[in-house]
């Protein structure tokens, strides 16, 4: 496929970006051809995690070492990621969907619209109930927003209801969901959004 759909996955370190990609790819790869690009600062650890998970053959996963400023590689100078896309398509010219995982960064990180067609931003409840109120650009501008690790809410004193209300304030009608990716809670909502809002748009 000459022009696959590209979805960026952003969020802070430990929020669940790699796990989200693993879970989504495991489901969608049964129906379509997928590739993944991971961005890490000085290692290719996320690439190794995905390879070891077995959700895709190693040739369909490319790790990019971004150096000290990971958000630059997905926005101001995305040349390494564009090169990785080209390499994926040389390896597998049938790829229909590519996930690009950003290096863990702050709440302001966003993807260049030239690099991705859609973006998902993920945070986790353990970062605190107040995180949605901070309204970082990654959360505000992403096409889909995920609040992960709902099981930790009682342990950190976070109200999921309050987080939902705060999210609606800064996102308006843009979609979001809660997840517990350890148990796949909320995963269907993410899959449904991808199939409905990205894959159909790409085919229209």
UniProtKB/Swiss-Prot annotation:
Record: residues binding GTP: 11-18
Keywords: Chaperone, Cytoplasm, GTP-binding, Nickel insertion, Nucleotide-binding
Gene Ontology biological process: urea catabolic process
GO terms of molecular function: GTP binding; GTPase activity; nickel cation binding
Keyword Lipid metabolism among record annotations: no
GO cellular component: cytoplasm
UniProt xrefs under Pfam families: cobW
CDD domains: UreG
Record-linked InterPro entries: CobW/HypB/UreG_nucleotide-bd, P-loop_NTPase, UreG
Protein localization: Cytoplasm
Chaperone found in the keyword field: yes
Function of the protein: Facilitates the functional incorporation of the urease nickel metallocenter. This process requires GTP hydrolysis, probably effectuated by UreG.
Family, per entry: Belongs to the SIMIBI class G3E GTPase family. UreG subfamily.
Subunit-level organization: Homodimer. UreD, UreF and UreG form a complex that acts as a GTP-hydrolysis-dependent molecular chaperone, activating the urease apoprotein by helping to assemble the nickel containing metallocenter of UreC. The UreE protein probably delivers the nickel.
Protein name, as recorded: Urease accessory protein UreG
Native species: Staphylococcus aureus (strain NCTC 8325 / PS 47)
């Amino acid at each position: 496929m000459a022009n696959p759909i590209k979805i960026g996955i952003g969020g802070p370190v430990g929020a669940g970006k790699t796990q989200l990609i693993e879970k989504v790819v495991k489901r969608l790869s049964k129906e379509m051809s997928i590739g993944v690009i991971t961005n890490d600062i000085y290692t290719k650890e996320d690439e190794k995690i995905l390879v070891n998970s077995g959700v895709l053959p190693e040739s369909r996963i490319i790790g990019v070492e971004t150096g000290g400023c990971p958000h630059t590689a997905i926005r101001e100078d995305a040349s390494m990621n564009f090169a990785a896309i080209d390499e994926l398509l040389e390896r597998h010219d049938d790829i229909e969907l590519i996930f690009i995982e950003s290096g863990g960064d702050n709440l302001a990180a966003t993807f260049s619209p030239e690099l991705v067609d859609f973006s998902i931003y993920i945070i986790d409840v353990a970062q605190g109930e107040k995180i949605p109120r901070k309204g970082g650009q990654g959360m505000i501008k992403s096409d889909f927003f995920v609040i992960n690790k709902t099981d930790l809410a009682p342990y950190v004193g976070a109200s999921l209801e309050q987080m939902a209300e705060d999210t609606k304030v800064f996102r308006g009608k843009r979609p979001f969901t809660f997840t517990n990716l350890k148990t796949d809670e909320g995963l269907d909502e993410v899959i449904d959004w991808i199939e409905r809002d990205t894959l159909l748009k790409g085919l229209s």
